[in-house]
Swiss-Prot record:
Reported function: DNA ligase that seals nicks in double-stranded DNA during DNA replication, DNA recombination and DNA repair.
Keywords: ATP-binding, Cell cycle, Cell division, DNA damage, DNA recombination, DNA repair, DNA replication, Ligase, Magnesium, Metal-binding, Nucleotide-binding
Protein name: DNA ligase
UniProt xrefs under NCBIfam families: dnl1 (TIGR00574)
Residue numbers annotated as active site: K250 (n6-amp-lysine intermediate)
InterPro entries membership: ATP-dep_DNA_ligase, DNA_ligae_ATP-dep_bac/arc, DNA_ligase_ATP-dep, DNA_ligase_ATP-dep_C, DNA_ligase_ATP-dep_cent, DNA_ligase_ATP-dep_N, DNA_ligase_N_sf, NA-bd_OB-fold
Keyword Chaperone in record: no
Record lineage: Archaea, Methanobacteriati, Thermoplasmatota, Thermoplasmata, Thermoplasmatales
Length: 585
């Protein structure tokens, strides 16, 4: 398939914010792609491979500007001026290409296959001379492309394709192109266990629907973890669970999935990032204490004091992440214990369709506790007094609260799902909300007075999982330290976009639109009906949405993707629960 055709489809996608229209455009594109489908699906995502493989192109804005200068004969200063005016390197490359560059007499045929393979080459070049080789490969794409093609190729390289489609929309496009809607839930389940859209696309195109219907966990391939809903009283939880639940501590750590196969171990975060290199102690200790052919476990890695057993806050784990140097020292400074609360796979057999009590029993039989690996503390009870005592003990021992888990026969492991099989409970409703919210930055307002020259406030949104959009819920201006405030323009600078991102639903107009990427943990006083914010618009009250009053920043959540943010439905449930508590008091 010619990449010029792909660029035309990308242009059409940029012109709409309607999800159904985006899905139809994608379906049409996928049907035309033929053998290029798998590569094309990755390119639509702005990637070359699934995230968990960690492939990076490694061509910075500065190197692209140098390449544009070399190919066009224009100075880097001139190109930087164009970049400043347009605010987008893809559009800059388009303008440079339009204004004339020296092209070869015999141009390469710019197919999807050719573009993809050139990008793979760019990602693979390392070591001495790699910068020149990467630049030459980009120039090769530039001189063989038309203006529109190089615009999108450059955006893919810089990680700023931003077509307004999330993985769920791409899945819908694939289903419309190659399958039937009746299989949609099963295909989504397959994707949650095997989060590689190229793999899903290939199987759908080849008619291998049974491969996807039978999909389950695969050692060394990360899965989307199961998540919990929330309620604000033990009584509500008992009623929701049908008085048939277990209760576990909710640890304040880093969600960790550990995969073991034939002596090899991989560790992944909640966001599917491989973090094996950050936890050499977990790897070494697992091999020392356990002997399996294969297994996959789900748990929480928590920093602790080995002398006292005291658990430390989550933020201390982050000191290890991304460190290549001084890791041995950090491992000594911040020892880790992994609290295991689920098992998905053992010795060649998937366990995800077993009820939770059976999976827990398998854990207890096969994982003997030691200093480095412990099972999540648990009780099985329907006595409200006992459950509350267990909750209070969890707080005393440094946890966030407890998680109720259904003991019913339907209590399977639902990858990627947030449902009522697991319900978290953090603390009683008092003067403010019983739980924090994870919200996405979608806009910024310029500061005044002491905050002049930086951002004064941020526009935050929740995630509407049904519509695949981000709906505004509050304007955040408190909880920042001076250091955080000065860092915000740097953190968000390359996320600033000229117009409202396609997936953002907002009636407010910030000074700067921010592409949804940064997640912040926020606490507030209460959720109120709002004519300004779009969260749950027209659901509670006609012409109004829901807003968080008096929001304040707790901490950034760099372990979460935008789609992991608090959902619209969760905020609706929190509003209803809050209203019920107020009416009782």
């Amino acid at each position: 398939m010619d990449f010029s055709d792909v660029a035309s489809y990308f242009s059409r996608m940029e012109e709409t914010t309607k999800r159904l229209e985006l899905t139809s455009i994608l379906a049409e594109l996928f049907k035309r792609s033929g053998d290029d489908l798998k590569k094309l699906v990755y390119l639509v995502q702005g990637k070359l491979m699934p995230d968990y493989l960690g492939i990076e192109l490694g061509l910075s804005d500065k190197l692209i500007i140098k390449s544009l200068s070399k190919a066009s004969g224009r100075s880097e200063e001139d190109i930087n001026r164009i970049f400043s005016r347009l605010g987008d390197l893809g559009s800059t490359a388009e303008e440079i290409s339009s204004s004339g560059i020296q092209r070869p007499l015999l141009k390469e045929s710019l197919t999807v296959d050719y573009v993809y393979n050139q990008l793979i080459k760019i990602s693979g070049y390392t070591g001495h001379g790699s910068i020149k080789t990467k630049m030459d490969a980009y120039i090769d794409l530039l001189i063989n492309s038309g203006p529109m093609e190089i615009k999108y190729i450059t955006r893919i390289i810089t990680g700023k394709l931003r077509l307004g489609v999330a993985d769920s929309t791409i899945l819908d496009g694939l289903i419309e192109a190659f399958s039937e809607k009746k299989y949609a839930d099963d295909i989504e389940t397959a994707y949650n266990f095997h989060p590689d859209l190229g793999y899903i696309a290939e199987n759908l195109m080849m008619g291998n629907i049974n491969e996807l219907l039978n999909a389950g966990p695969v050692p060394l391939i990360p899965f989307k973890v199961m998540l919990a809903e929330r309620l604000q009283s033990i009584s509500d939880i008992r009623n929701k669970m049908g008085h048939n639940a277990s209760y576990e501590y909710k640890y304040d750590g880093l969600r960790t999935q550990l995969h073991f196969l034939k002596g090899g171990i991989k560790i992944f975060s909640r966001g599917l990032e491989e973090t094996t290199s950050s936890f050499p102690d977990i790897v070494q200790n697992f091999k020392s204490y356990y002997s399996f052919d294969s297994c996959i476990i789900d748990g929480e890695s928590v920093p602790y004091n080995p002398e006292t057993g005291e658990l430390y806050p989550f933020q201390m784990v982050s000191k290890r992440r991304g460190r290549k140097y001084e890791l041995t020292e950090k491992t000594r400074e911040v020892p880790i214990v992994m609290f295991i609360f689920d098992i998905l796979y053992l010795n060649g057999k998937s366990l995800v369709n077993l009820p939770y009590p059976e999976r827990r029993s398998i854990l207890e039989k096969n994982f003997k506790e030691n200093e480095y690996f412990k099972l999540a503390k648990r009780i099985v009870s329907d006595d409200e007094h006992d459950i509350m005592k267990f909750f209070e003990r969890s707080i005393e021992e440094g946890c966030e609260g407890i998680v109720a888990k259904s003991n019913g026969i339907d209590s399977i492991y639902r990858a990627g799902a947030r449902g009522w099989l697991w319900i978290k409970f953090k603390r009683d409703y008092q003067s403010e909300l019983s739980d924090s919210l994870d919200l996405v930055v979608v806009g910024a307002f310029d500061g005044h007075g002491r905050r002049k020259g930086t951002f004064g406030a941020l526009l935050l949104a929740c995630y509407n999982s049904k519509d695949d959009t981000f709906e505004t819920v509050c304007k955040l201006g408190s909880g920042f330290t001076d250091e955080m405030l000065s860092e915000m323009p740097r953190l968000l600078g390359d996320k600033i976009v000229e117009k409202k991102p396609a997936r953002v639903n907002s009636s407010m107009e910030p000074d700067h639109w921010i592409y949804p990427s940064l997640v912040l943990e926020i606490r507030g006083a209460e959720i109120t009906v709002s004519p300004v914010h779009t969260c749950a618009m027209n659901i509670i009250e006609k012409g109004s949405g829901l807003a968080l009053r008096f929001p304040r920043l707790i901490k950034p959540r760099d372990d979460k993707k935008p789609e992991d943010a608090t959902t619209t439905n969760e905020i609706i449930e929190m509003y209803k629960a809050q209203k019920k508590v107020i009416e009782k008091s």
